[in-house]
């Protein structure tokens, strides 16, 4: 049976559109507040052990809510927004509670939900419920996040929201509900195309409107924000005219193969669609049309086509002739003057195994993307449903894993040079899934934990669908680490290459053993020393590592254990350290005193190797 699938896409234009960055040098972006619970500070820290404990440092760049019994007002923006994209970093104190309101009416919950296994609408990034008629009435219509991507209190987290305001007719009657087009917490999509039937609990008004201010709750507990970026999407979109088209039948490799051929079919169409060809492959479609830019400024173009395609505006090549897979998007930014512009789109395809697809979006300054294609043109045939693997019990899964490495030095043969220069395919990777929904990838070639993630376990479609490529993908919020040896000789403390580049000391993986519960302990040798790397997850919050050195332990005297590598590592408490601007915590046990050394912009936190070294990653 063939299934028709609308390939999922959301055209992101925020990074390419004009952004407003809220300058947190003062509180001028926000309405004057009679009480003083909101402060401009340089940074904050939150205690992992004490509820509602947050301490500021003097300076600018962060806005923090530090409520007292008397001072606990909300923060409301001066500016009002309709359709908008907004992103920011935030930090929660332990067991603290806040909320970010779109238009002062629709709350995205902010809460210390660290380790919560089954999140509700009241957990972090949940959409808070509505109340019937009065503040004391029952709750209804709340929306829990798809997964719990919340980090530990005291760490900076990141939230991205794409919001579409409700629509009203000329009489003021609501004709379309507000929508959250997408909500992303710490890199994990937690809501998508979510309809909001009305204001959630605690709004500035139950009456909906075309525009409204941002509001941040300040009456519950300490919370801090920084790096606010706003893209107002309420502007006028481009106006698109009709298209003429030519269809040339045949299998073509290059534009010159059909440049001088007579068209087999011509016509006009209101919207772009590959369907004018009348078949799925063996065609070249050439479209010519026009659109009107509502004002002068940057326009963001996104083209998604199966096969080869190109795009010209006013006769200038914007996207050159290039082959792309059906799900791949290409984009460009171009400054256009107000008024009419010509456009030409070429799409030719001879790949019978791939479904046809043609989509084009243009976002004018301050407006969302306008689709120039028909809905039928962005439907594709998909052979199978996603193949996923869950971890109802401790689960070990072997596959390739593509990872992003923040600090590793390029040069390893497995680095990928395509889209992300710091991405790498780990070929001897072990994926360990835990029922508490904190999982990790271990590289047997380096004795390294290269990433952690929160949420569901694996998407194995890349491995098992059709021919596959042997890889799997995490399903959740990811903490990238580095694919470098955990244990090295002291002279290699700042060597961020892999064990393959250290043949002298003889790193040799020995595989892993499983205990009675199914948890692995990894084993390898280095300079004649046998090392057992026991890794256990606790409560979905922490990853605990214990290294035991045996046989040839005299050689371990010259070795060190790298607990963390980063650009910025700071001590934040007894046996507690933060890495890379509070991205995650490192905690040592047993009275061990880690050493911190830095050079060339890289810091390493390490302990001398002895019979046993233990530490914990809190994230």
Task: Say what each PLM segment does.
Residues 1-19:
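Bacterial Sec-dependent N-terminal signal peptides
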Residues 19-260, 266-274, 279-288, 292, ...:
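Carbohydrate-interacting regions of secretory-pathway proteins
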Residues 20, 78, 379-544, 555-583, ...:
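Beta-strand-rich N-terminal accessory domains
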Residues 86, 90, 543-551:
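Short, well-ordered beta-strand segments enriched in hydrophobic/aromatic residues
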Residues 90, 160-163, 344-348, 522-526, ...:
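Short, hydrophobic/aromatic-enriched beta-strand segments in well-ordered soluble domains
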Residues 176, 184-188, 192, 304, ...:
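Short strand-turn-strand beta-turns centered on an Asx-Gly dipeptide
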Residues 194, 234-393:
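Acidic/polar, compositionally biased interaction segments
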Residues 194-204, 271, 313-332, 570-605:
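Solvent-exposed beta-strand/loop surfaces of large extracellular or lumenal domains
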């Amino acid at each position: 049976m063939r299934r028709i699938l609308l390939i999922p896409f959301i055209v992101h234009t925020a990074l390419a559109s004009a952004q407003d960055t809220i300058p947190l040098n003062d509180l001028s972006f926000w309405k004057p507040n009679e009480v003083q619970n909101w402060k401009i500070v340089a940074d904050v820290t939150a205690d992992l052990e004490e509820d509602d404990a947050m301490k500021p440092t003097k300076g600018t760049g962060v806005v923090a809510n530090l409520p007292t019994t008397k001072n606990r007002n909300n923060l409301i923006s001066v500016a009002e927004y309709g359709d908008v994209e907004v992103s920011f970093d935030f930090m929660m104190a332990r067991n603290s509670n806040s909320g970010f309101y779109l238009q002062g009416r629709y709350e995205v919950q902010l809460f210390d939900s660290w380790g919560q296994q089954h999140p509700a609408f009241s957990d972090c990034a949940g959409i808070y419920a509505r109340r019937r008629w009065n503040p004391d009435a029952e709750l209804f219509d709340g929306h829990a996040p798809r997964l719990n991507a919340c980090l530990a209190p005291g760490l900076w987290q990141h939230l991205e929201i794409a919001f579409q305001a409700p629509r009203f007719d000329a009489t003021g009657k609501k004709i379309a509900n507000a929508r959250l087009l997408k909500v992303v917490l710490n890199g994990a999509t937690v809501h998508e195309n979510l309809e909001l039937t009305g204001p959630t609990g605690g709004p500035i008004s139950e009456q909906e409107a075309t525009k409204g201010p941002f509001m941040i709750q300040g009456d519950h507990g300490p919370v801090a924000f920084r790096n606010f970026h706003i893209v107002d999407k309420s502007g006028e979109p481009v106006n698109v005219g009709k298209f003429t088209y030519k269809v040339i039948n045949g299998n073509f490799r290059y534009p010159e193969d059909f440049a001088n051929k007579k068209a087999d079919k011509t016509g006009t169409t209101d919207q772009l669609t590959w369907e004018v060809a009348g078949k799925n492959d063996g065609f070249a479609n050439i479209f010519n049309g026009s659109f009107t830019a509502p004002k002068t400024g940057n326009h963001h173009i996104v083209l998604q086509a199966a096969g080869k395609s190109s795009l010209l505006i006013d006769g200038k090549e914007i996207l050159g002739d290039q082959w792309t897979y059906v799900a791949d998007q290409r984009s460009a930014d171009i400054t256009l003057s107000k008024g009419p512009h010509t456009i030409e789109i070429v799409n030719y395809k001879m790949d019978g195994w791939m479904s046809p697809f043609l989509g084009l979006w243009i976002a004018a300054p301050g407006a969302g993307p306008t689709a120039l294609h028909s809905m039928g043109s962005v439907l594709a045939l998909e052979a199978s449903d996603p193949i996923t693997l869950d971890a109802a019990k401790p689960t070990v899964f072997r596959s390739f894993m593509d990872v992003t490495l923040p600090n590793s030095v390029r040069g390893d043969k497995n680095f990928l040079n395509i889209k992300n220069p710091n991405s790498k395919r780990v070929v001897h990777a072990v994926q360990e899934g835990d029922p508490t929904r904190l999982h990790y990838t271990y590289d047997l070639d380096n004795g390294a934990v290269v990433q952690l993630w929160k949420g569901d376990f694996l998407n194995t479609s890349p491995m098992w669908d059709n021919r596959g490529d042997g890889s799997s993908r995490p399903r959740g919020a990811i903490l990238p680490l580095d694919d470098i040896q955990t244990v090295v000789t002291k002279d290699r403390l700042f060597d961020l290459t892999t064990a393959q580049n250290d043949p002298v000391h003889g790193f040799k993986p020995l595989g892993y053993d499983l205990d009675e519960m199914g948890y692995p302990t990894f084993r390898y040798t280095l300079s004649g020393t046998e090392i057992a790397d026991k890794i256990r997850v606790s409560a979905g919050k922490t990853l605990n590592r214990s290294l035991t050195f045996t046989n040839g332990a005299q050689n371990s005297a010259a070795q060190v254990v790298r607990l963390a590598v980063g650009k910025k590592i700071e001590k934040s408490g007894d046996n507690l350290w933060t890495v890379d601007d509070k991205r995650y915590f490192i905690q040592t046990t047993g009275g061990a005193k880690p050493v911190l050394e830095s050079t060339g912009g890289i810091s390493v936190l390490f302990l001398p190797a002895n019979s046993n070294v233990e530490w914990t990653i809190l994230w």
